[in-house]
Each structure stands twice: as structure tokens, then as C-alpha cells.
Amino acid sequence: MPLTTSTSGDGSASALPTARISRKPSEPAASASVPDASAPFTTFIERYRAKLRDLFERRVDADALNAQRGLPPFLLREIRDTDPLSVYVAEEHGGRGGHIHEGLAMLEATGYESLGLCLTFGINGALFLQPVGKYGSDDTKTDVLQRFLRDRRLGGLMITEPDHGTDALNMRTTFEADGERYRIHGTKHWGGLTGWADYWLLTAREQTAKGPGRDIGFFVCDVTQPEQHIEVEEVYENLGLRIIPYGRNQIDVSVPQAQRLEPDSTGIKMMLDLLHRSRMQFPGMSTGFLRRLLDETVDHCRERFVGGKPLEAYDNVKATLAKMQAYVTSSRAMSLFTSEHGGTDRDLSGMSLAANAIKTSVTDWMQQASQSFLQLCGAKGYRMDHLAGRATVDSRPFQIFEGANDILYQQVAEAVLKQMRRAKESNLYRFLQQDDLTARAADYFRETLSFDVDLSLPQRKLVALGEALSRVMSMEMTIELGERGYRADLIEQALTEMHADVQELVTRFRTDGVQGLIDDYRASSDWLQFVQARP
């Protein structure tokens, strides 16, 4: 039988054993002081970084902390006292204005110290505060956003269902009008901050006489209210990101009509706008994390001696460090791109190419950098209380949630091929030369990409092509960062590394001969029968 409890306003879940449920710090009283939102951003971010350093480098054992479930009661409370989530809220609701570059910088500072905490704030910002601020009714925005900052609330998003993850448009959670309220029924799982969040954005399809409708509705659910409690049926033993609780939730709530988000056109377009903006903000999380891994790896390679010389003196190690350094530079370039193209004043529902290329690239780099750090650390890194081991398991789900990377790569390729059909262009290089996301980077591949593409490719080819195209787009953003005056040596290094990656990916794309699964593969496949007796 699954353990069952309901979340309350303080996020407690008393029916669950403490070993199974994450600890949410008690919230300060409503009269708690809120930092001055009008302070210059340099003052704000330096104060925030200082608080993070004080907590993670002096007051807690960060390695042990991130290997445990939940957070110490004081930690999130003290961090929230610097009001980091105010960067996602408009000034009229007590925030700093909702500027994208401020949110990215806040996430970068957080990610350097703790990837789990960084994701916690990313969930609150991109998946709750930004959509509520953009699509919420005036009454909902005034009430929810002001209380969110004043009372140190937490918010999250529930889309995924046990049988509908990637297939979210066929979700089974439904809503129907009930007087001046909406009744919502269904099951959601893998929503980050399960049992913690005070507010949820719930997604559902309208129940009609013919079954669930095609469009998606979004509703703000305030679990502090009696008719809006969400039952937590099970808390999952997630492998990584252990400070964030995940689980399965039974939804049977009634919310006021005013708490339904108001799309500009359709709910599906609103969902795409929300998800694309969230994916475009992944560099905020990746940059700080990648910087930390680079710093730690460099320190280790300078201090660790093998064969009478430091690890950093070995050629293969130098190549690894250069690649990790390139990841940081390109992730920063993507932050620049997002800060100028990802604002809530824009409709991002049609920006799948940039959003998918950004999300897939930076999350692949996060995992690759983690694997490199772990490899160089050797056995001592293979522990949950060591940054190398923890980074490897913590970064892995970033390649899965908000769109599995292989599916997103396929979508990148399909989008480009669709545009090529419209332009009646079959040569990949010529097409990329004309596209704003690839024009300058395409010149690095005049020969490599100058071939006609079959516009009806099998899925495996689409995935390989999409990965290569995503790296070309990454190069374009890196070129732009360089032209703004960023360090030329770091730009050249990043472009060199990505150029090599694209060459390798294109080779894989153009290689034939990959077969599918051979049926009945267990028959006649025992190698022992082929052992020859010694003479």
C-alpha cells in the first residue's frame, strides 16, 4: 500500500516517516523583512553570493549536505532572506522587475555551490513565477506573487503523469467547470518539490461529453486552502538531486475560476511558450555548475602527481581540461542569447529550435564534464559525498526532464528539414548560411556540411543530425559573444572544441550500416561452446 499524506501550507507531510520525506525549513512570519528590491543589481548579486559562500563554504559541509535528503531547517530560510526569487517578479508585485539576465545570474551563482538548490530556484522561477506573472489574472498575480515573496513561499509545475511523460498532450488529468470554480482530477508524478511547494501550476484537459478535450488548461493551486490540498501518495527514492523531493500525487481539488491562467491564444501555445522559455534558461543552471567542475578539476590535476608529475602535465588531461573550459564559455554565450531573446514580453512558442538546441547542448556538457571530473578523480570520486560522484548522478536527469535530449535532437532536425522544404533548398550548408541561428558558424563547415540532405530521414539519422545542428547553433552564439568583446582566447578555444565535435557528429550521421535488434538473440549465442581444448 502506498503511503498517503496531504501537503499543508508549511509543506509538512507528517504521515510519512522522516527518513522518506525531505525536510522543508519552517517559513518566517509574514512580517519578515524583505530586502530592498530597488537596490542595484551588482549590490543584490554580491550580497547573494556572499550569503551562499558563508553557508556552503563555512557553515555547512556541502558534500555531506548534498548526499542527504532535504535541507537543514535554517539553510533555505537564510538564503530566502536575501530574496533571490525576487528576480522573477515584476516591480509592482514587490520584485526586481523580472529581467531575464538577473535570473540567469542568480542561477549561475547558486549552481556553483549546489546544483540541487539551483534547480529548486529554477523550478520556482521558470515553471511557476514567470508563467503566473505573464498569464495570471490581475487578482491572482497580486495575491500570489506578493505572498510568494513576503511569506517565502515555494511553487512548482505538474505536467508529467505515470503513463504520459514525453506524450504530455495526451495527459489524463481533466478539469470541468463547477459553478465559479474548476474541479480537477488526475494523477501527477515527478513534480520537483513534491510535498514542499505551497503553490502548484496544475495542467489538465477539459472533460467533455466526448472525453478529454485537445487543449491544455493551467491552474494555480494553493495547497494552503482547504479545497486545494494535494495528496502525496508516494515519495520517490530519487537517485540524484537528493535535496529535492519527488513523488506521485493524487489530484482532486477545486480552484476558483480566477486561478486559471489566461493564454493569448491556446493553452498548448502557452505551454510551448513556458517550456521554451524554461529550456532557454538552462544555461543559468549549467554555467555555475560547469564553472565549479572546472575549478575543482583544475585544482585536482595540479595537486595530484602521477609518475612524478602533476596530472595537468599529461597531454590527454590537457585536452580534457580544454574541453571543460570550452563548455563554460559556450554556456555563457547561451546565457547572453537568452537574456536578449527569452523575456516574458516575447512569445517563445515558435522558438523551438533555439530552445531545444540550448537545453540539449548544455545538459550534455554537464554530464560530460561530470564524467571527466570523476574519471580524473579516480576511486575517491566514486562516492555520494564527493563532488565528482554526486555531480555525475545529479546532472544526469537534466538530459531527461523537460524533454529527453534524443527526442529534442530529433525535433531540431525535423524543424530544420521542414524549413529547408519550404525554402526548396536541399544543400545543408547553403541553408545554414541563410539562417540567423547558424549563418556565421556555417562558414566553419563549408566542406563538411556541403551535401544534399535526404528530407525523409530515419529517426536515428534525425537524432544524429539534430545533435550536430545544435552544436552549430552553439557555435553561432559563441561567435556573437566573441564579437561583443569577450576574451578572444577563450572564444577561439570553444570554437575549436565545438568544431571538432560537429565534425565527429557529422561523420556519425553520414555513416551507414547500423542495424536493428536481432530477434531471438539468446539462441546459439553461448561462447563456451566455441572453447577449444588445449593440445
Residue positions per predicted region:
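Amphipathic, small/basic residue-rich leader segments at the start of a protein or domain
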Residues: 1-123, 140-150, 446-535
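Glycine-rich phosphate/cofactor-binding loops in nucleotide/flavin-utilizing enzymes
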Residues: 9-10, 17-23, 379-447, 457-458, ...
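C-terminal helix-coil-helix/basic helical segment that borders enzyme active sites and/or dimer interfaces
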Residues: 63-64, 328-361, 374-375
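Glycine-rich phosphate/pyrophosphate-binding beta-alpha loops
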Residues: 112, 189-195, 398-401
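N-terminal glycine-rich flavin-associated loop
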Residues: 119-139, 165-168, 302
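A short, Trp-centered hydrophobic/proline-enriched beta-strand micro-motif
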Residues: 150-160
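A short core secondary-structure module
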Residues: 185-230
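Glycine-rich beta->alpha junctions and the first turn(s) of the following alpha-helix
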Residues: 232, 236-327, 396-407, 414-483
